[in-house]
Amino acid sequence: RVEKRKPFDFSDLKSIIFGSAGMVLILIFVVHFCQTGLQGITGLYVVDKFGFSTKQVGVIWMALAGILIVVQGFLTGPLAKKIGEKRLILIGMFCKALVAFAMVLTTGFVSVLVVFGLFAVSSAITVPTLNATLSKTDNQHKGTLMGFASTAGNLSKVIAPLLTGYLYESNIELPYITTGGIALIGVVICYIWIKNQKNK
């Protein structure tokens, strides 16, 4: 027997946006914004600031991909079970803020590699965990929520390059400071979300 789903009612939109699912959607926007902003500007940043060669930039992206594969494939699931999905998201958001501010303090190839390694870890633990959390939030409107999540992610991928590119023209370090501030807002939102869930 196939269970019929309740058709989406726009009166439910308010409860979704202002409920737990709404918090997750905001976090998805913030996470994708930070990732797109950092990834899009770093190639230019390391060339302009340090004069990195194409080979050095390639090594950074290769290391990023390798760490992402290892952490997401082998560590994210066990960590989520051990400390909880919400706490793992909070840690990942904090790491994103740390990465953004730390990039301003980098002094060369090794420090950039270390900072971007942390960026890879934060990406590997936040994105899949957020998606998993969203899928458990509201079974009745799961398809609608996934659509909202996709929209939030895509919107951030449009806004982030435009904003960071504009800021980069004024000061090459300003995109990192701005992204770090946005990531800290994400940390606060995540903390409030966790506290609200505990109080229920």
List each language-model region with its residue ranges:
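Paired intracellular helix-loop junctions of major facilitator superfamily
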Residues: L134-K142
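A membrane-interface helix-boundary motif in multi-pass transporters
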Residues: T164-A183
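Juxtamembrane intracellular "pre-TM" segments in multi-pass secondary transporters
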Residues: R1-L27
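Pair of pore-lining "gating" transmembrane helices in MFS-fold secondary transporters
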Residues: F18-G37, G117
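Short amphipathic helix-loop junctions that connect adjacent transmembrane helices
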Residues: G40-V57
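Helix-to-loop junctions at the C-terminal end of transmembrane segments
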Residues: V71-E85, Y168
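A late C-terminal transmembrane helix in Major Facilitator Superfamily
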Residues: H141-E169
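C-terminal transmembrane helical hairpin of 12-TM major facilitator-type secondary transporters
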Residues: E85-L130
